[in-house]
């Protein structure tokens, strides 16, 4: 089924000094008209209530960038071995209480779900601010934090699920990029 609220935009060019994903996201952002803009990954699965709940949470928390940590779908043997360890390492490096603290902040965001207030996204320069960063999610968190706006990260509790890598080769290259 096609949703009339979704437009598929094709882009066949990317400036040399840009990461491809950032370039594509920037193009999409130029077409966004609402007060909030959401960037997500194609391998995520949303609960029907996720976006509504996320916008309500961002407003309630006065967050200009709200990111959600997905519930990882683990089906392959290598995921069973590595995903729990890798996730634990990420949470040790970026403790949730520090991410969401107003005083001892450690900026972090998860690229699987980046919900921006459109005004903050525009104020920081949008994807131009992170155009060549392979970890644009963390870069965005730092830029938003440095601008004085608030970044918040929440756990998905099953509302956002992700099966990150379809093969062992993509699994290896994906985690190498992160670490």
State the predicted function of each range:
Residues 11, 40-42:
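Catalytic metal- and UDP-sugar-binding loop of GT-A-like glycosyltransferases, i.e.
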